[in-house]
Amino acid sequence: ADILEGIEVKHLIIKNEKFFISTNRGNFEADQVVIATGAYHVPNRHPLSERLPTNILQIDAREYKNANTLPDGPVLVVGSGQSGCQIAEDLFFEKRKVHLSVGSAPRSPRMYRGRDVVDWLDRMGYYSMPIGEHDDPKSVRNKTNHYLTGRDNGREIDLRRRAIEGMNLHGRLEELTINDIQFSNDLSKNLDGADSVYCRIRNSIDEWISKNNIEAPKGEIYTPCWEPTEDVKGTQLECKNLAVVIWCT
């Protein structure tokens, strides 16, 4: 069958077990429809963004290309989902001074006990489980994607490791004036929450392997390598020390 690209679907109904689709290129009928849409392509800046000084460049995650396309100087990345963490790492590895506002996004292993974690979860039936069978269907629908990366042939992201190497981590953005940015004192809580999900995924794989007597390499115990201390709370940042803010919210 031909593939038509750039089609805007305006309306979709089902009638007599048939789907009827209205688009900007006419009407179509189908026996099956796969809905694979989302809002990740729609910018969602924090309302306080309007208060930033005009000399600071503001861009959204979808506008980011690489470090060379940005003005020289420190960068604040707001949001620690997949885009935020990957962009922060990319800039950090290009020797830019990076500040990352860390939210409640969870993280995941990339490889564990000899396989890609997605492979394990698929074998365990996780991706085949209907929404209604989850403990909390509503939260599953709205859950943020776990952060990891395809960089270096695919690997996990440990923000604690980046902090040891020099990335500046802050809590969730709380207040913003023309002079400074205030962050919530929740960095430890957010890092612990991400690690909790990370360890829970590993534990579920361990249980599956044990239950099904599967031969697999032994897993290592995760131990946090860094903790925020009183002198690195990172709850305030002066706007004069920033060149760019990237919104990954």
What are these regions (language model features)?
Residues 1-249:
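Flavin (primarily FAD) cofactor-binding/catalytic cores of flavoenzymes
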